Design a protein with these regions (language model features):
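Conserved active-site neighborhood of enzyme catalytic/cofactor-binding cores
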Residues: 2, 48-82, 97-99, 180-182, ...
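Extracellular/luminal Protease-associated
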Residues: 245-302
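Active-site cores of enzymes that catalyze phosphoryl transfer or operate on phosphate-rich substrates
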Residues: 249, 352-356, 456
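N-terminal, positively charged nucleic-acid-binding surface of large information/translation enzymes
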Residues: 1-237, 278-291, 295-309, 321, ...
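Short Cys/His-rich metal-coordination motifs, predominantly Zn2+-binding knuckles/fingers
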Residues: 183, 254, 354-355, 425-427
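A glycine-biased structural micro-motif
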Residues: 243-246, 312-325
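Short beta-alpha connecting loops at secondary-structure transitions
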Residues: 105-118, 307-318, 542-547, 571-578
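Short acidic, glycine-rich loop/turn motifs
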Residues: 206-212, 236, 250-255, 424-426
Length: 596
């Protein structure tokens, strides 16, 4: 029998594809729940269903694959659980753009028909990222692939919401949110891009009530919000304003009196030392307002136009926020109430997808009591039950968790897990697993059957992805896989989602899995930058496409390069020169094997 011979020239494209299919067909990547071998689990961070492979993906999935392959070869029963995230806003935007190209508006189509369009899009295009991961050589257990909107995970989300609501951990509250007036939804802090820019700051004069010619000066970059001011704050130790504390200032244009309050939020060495407090349009002002019992005056509509309310003079009602700014400044100037204008460096929040300026906006939303959930999650890391590698990331985790704020989980979208809440005729809320249970609960409450209206909002995608380590294993059912593969051995991820995903998995996992952590280690890897150490971006033209690199150099060359350069704590400066070197190395290995 003739021994097969290796080709003279190493062709990674054909060789890698052939071996990958061989391993896949043989079930080499599958876990073995009935095995007596010790299990080893990695939960794949689910990429967005809209996504395509980028260098960050290439790094994190290469590192995960190395760990899985090593432990598989060492005889462990390995589970690398794959899946994709439904990516609420991103997916809805993709399908909306496709419909817009056909001159179809989402709202004209209607909710049910629009959601059906999204499912059609997913069936056609939603699996792209996993096909690309296979080209990278990722040896995940693909037969166990999950989606955060599949039936099993949806059931887990509903149970979680209902149970947490009954435990008092989910509640409805009127608070400030990051409102995107273009997408017309609240968005998370992760979806807000803070952009430094030069802005005008205007110094305005508010007259002191009961005086002829005494004013207090405040500075603002957003004069259009002054109509919603609830107070002027001064530092309690500022001697300049001691005589004014407790008195009233007259709000220009609307002539509404507002109190002058003492609060340490006002800094004596910043500006005039006096600050306008607009609780409904600034996150810091909101907290000051709560301390002093100030009113919440929502000045704007969902599209960021001025509301038609008594607090806003009629001439400004209906104006876009920036048109209102110009008109208000002109009127203040005409009354001699603008002291001066200066140009300052300012950080302005923008929606990372819409590109528009975010408006802090007061509205009723659903919240999670994250402070309560964080307590055991903090303790678990303090006790070393979950370890961060490198260890310095403990500090980042602790700082955020110990200062955690209520988590806004409702989104004004159509695509996502719809909130299981129904409202009675008087606004009474009924949170149940399904409509039938809600109708029964309402009938008991009212003594008769009444019509109910379901909540229109969906859940933040981080809510469902926070359940990923155990919902993918069959929870809430107590499956054999759940008992065998939970908790995971290691989570591999970047530092940028410690707050948004790692922390939420810790909180949710420990709450629903009897205090057991979701993973024993969290390996935080570096970022992939260009060869000069700059962040890759399309605008800079320095983006390296991993799929193009795989075509040119082979998947093993790319994986070898990333693994070799992934030293702890140092960002990877990626260059094609490095790739060429490791491609040559793989060729040498091939030639050595031919020689043998």
């Amino acid at each position: 029998m003739t021994e097969p011979t290796l080709a003279k020239t190493y062709d990674p494209k054909s060789i890698e594809a052939n071996w990958y299919e061989t391993w896949l067909d043989s079930g080499h990547f599958a876990c073995a729940p009935d095995s007596k071998a010790t299990p080893y689990t990695i939960m794949m961070p689910p990429p967005n269903v809209t996504g395509s492979l980028h260098m960050g993906h290439a790094l994190t999935f290469t590192l995960q694959d190395l760990l899985i392959r090593y432990h598989r070869m060492a005889g462990r029963d390995t589970l690398w659980q794959p899946g994709t995230d439904h990516a609420g806003i991103a997916t809805q935007m993709v399908v909306e753009r496709q419909l817009a190209a056909q001159n179809i508006a989402r709202r004209d189509l209607g909710r049910d028909a629009f959601i059906e369009k999204i499912w059609e899009w997913k069936a056609e295009s939603g699996g792209m990222i996993h096909k690309q991961l296979r080209r990278l050589g990722a040896s995940a257990d693909w037969q166990r692939e999950r989606f955060t909107m599949d039936d099993g995970l949806s059931a887990a989300v509903i149970k979680t919401f209902v149970q947490m609501h009954r435990e008092g951990l989910i509640y409805r509250d009127k608070r400030l949110v990051n409102w995107d007036p273009k997408l017309m939804t609240a968005i998370s802090d992760l979806e807000v891009e803070q952009i430094e820019q030069k802005s005008s700051m205007w110094h305005l004069k508010y007259k002191i009530e009961g005086t002829e010619n005494e004013y207090i000066s405040i500075a603002t970059t957003r004069p259009e919000t002054m109509l919603g001011d609830g107070a002027v704050a001064v530092n309690p130790d500022d001697e300049r304003y001691q005589h004014l504390i407790g008195k009233m200032a007259i709000l220009p244009l609307s002539n509404r009196p507002i109190p002058i309050v003492a609060d340490e939020y006002a800094k004596m060495d910043k500006g005039s030392g006096a600050v306008k407090i607009t609780p409904a349009h600034d996150f810091n002002d909101f907290e000051v307002g709560r301390r002093h019992g100030l009113p919440l005056i929502n000045l704007m509509t969902a599209t960021a136009s001025m509301e038609s309310i008594p607090e806003i003079p009629e001439k400004y009602q209906g104006l876009d926020r920036y048109d209102a700014r110009r008109q208000i400044l002109a009127d203040l100037d005409a009354q001699g109430l603008v002291e001066r204008e200066e140009i300052v460096e300012n950080v302005v929040p923008h929606g990372d997808r819409s590109g528009v300026v975010i408006e802090p906006w007061v509205m009723d939303q659903w919240y999670v009591n994250a402070e309560e959930l964080a307590k055991p999650a903090i303790k678990a890391v303090e006790e070393g039950r979950t370890k961060f590698v490198p260890e310095r990331w403990n500090k980042t985790y602790f700082e955020w968790m110990r200062n955690i704020q209520p988590w806004c989980i409702s989104r004004q979208l159509w695509w996502g897990h719809r909130i299981p809440a129904w409202y009675g005729p008087d606004g009474q809320v009924f949170v149940e697993a399904n409509e039938a249970d809600a109708i029964d609960a309402a009938a008991k409450h009212y003594g008769k059957t009444v019509p109910l209206t379901r909540d229109e909002d969906v859940l933040d995608t981080w809510f469902s992805s926070g359940l990923w380590p155990f919902s993918t294993l069959g929870w809430p059912d107590q499956t054999a896989e759940l008992k065998r593969y939970y908790p995971g051995d290691v989570l591999v991820t970047g530092f940028d989602i410690i707050f948004f995903w790692v922390a939420r998995m810790m909180m949710m996992g420990m709450h629903f899995m009897d205090g057991e952590v979701p993973f024993r280690e969290v390996y935080i890897h570096a970022l992939v930058r260009d060869e000069k150490g700059q962040k890759m971006s399309k605008s800079k033209g320095n983006v390296l496409d991993p799929l193009e690199l795989i075509d040119q150099y082979g998947a093993d060359s790319l994986r070898f390069t990333l693994a070799a350069m992934a030293a702890q704590g140092r960002d990877i400066k990626m260059s094609t020169t490095r790739l060429e070197g490791y491609r040559n190395f793989t060729t040498k290995i091939w030639n050595a094997c031919r020689f043998l």
